[in-house]
Each structure stands twice: as structure tokens, then as C-alpha cells.
Amino acid sequence: MKFIIFCAIVMAVSVSGFIVDVDTEDKWRNAFDHMLMEEFEEKMDQIEHGLLMLSEQYKELEKTKSKELKEQILRELTIAENYLRGALKFMQQEAKRTDLNMFERYNFETAVSTIEILVKDLAELAKKVKAVKSDD
């Protein structure tokens, strides 16, 4: 008997999700924003990991003074910085939207500040790499 009641409750809850009508455009936009922020967080993790790896390569560059390593690090820094500058413009534009609630606005503003910090860190590392005198 308890099992039948439990099944009825589960079925009622699952069906009630289909009965409640939500504006489909708003639902899509929130789903898009959620997916966008998940992708953004994943890419920022990758860039932060890449920045850590480039910092380690910079330490190696200080020891070896290799011209090839210096050029490789500068290329990777340039690519990451350009990617972040494009993402910064997009996130600033999204943060200006008027349909955002307080939580969504906070997410976009946090994304903007995160990107600005990473761009600054990449630029500082690029200055350090350029300052290293290579042997060649």
C-alpha cells in the first residue's frame, strides 16, 4: 500500500512539471545563460591552468634563455589574451541586458571582473617574458 502511495506521489510530481506553463522564451534564455556560464567557467579554468603552465615555462626560460621557448610563450600569451579580450567585450555587452535578474547580473559582472584580472595577469607575464634576454 505504501508503495502504491509513493508511486502516485512520484507520478503526480512528475506530471505537475508538465502542467505548469512557463514562458518558453524566458525558459530558453535562462537555459542559454546557464549553459553560457558553465562554458565560461570551464574555459576560464583552462586559461588559468594554461597561465600556470606558462608561468612554469617562464621559470624555465629564465634558466635556459631559449629564443624558441620565448617565442612560444609569447604566442600562447597573445592567443589567450586575444581570446579573453573578445570574451570581455561579449560579457560586458551581456551584463548590460535589462532582462537579467539580480543573480544573473551578478554572474555576468563576476565574469567581467574575472576576465579583466586574467588579462592583467597575462599582460604582466608577457612583459616579464619580453624582458628576458635570449641567447640567440
From Swiss-Prot:
Changing E56A: Decreaced IgE-binding by some of the 24 patients tested. It holds the Pfam family Blo-t-5. Residues 1-17 form the signal peptide. Changing H34A: Decreaced IgE-binding by some of the 24 patients tested. Changing E68A: Decreaced IgE-binding by some of the 24 patients tested. Changing K63A: Decreased IgE-binding by more than half of the 24 patients tested. Identified as a major epitope. Changing E124A: Decreaced IgE-binding by some of the 24 patients tested. Changing E39A: Decreaced IgE-binding by some of the 24 patients tested. One of its GO terms (molecular function) is protein homodimerization activity. Changing E76A: Decreaced IgE-binding by some of the 24 patients tested. Changing D121A: Decreaced IgE-binding by some of the 24 patients tested. Changing R105A: Decreaced IgE-binding by some of the 24 patients tested. InterPro entries: Mite_allergen_group-5/21, Mite_allergen_group-5/21_sf. Changing E48A: Decreaced IgE-binding by some of the 24 patients tested. Changing E71A: Decreaced IgE-binding by some of the 24 patients tested. Belongs to the mite group 5 allergen family. Monomer. Homodimer. This is Mite allergen Der f 21.0101.
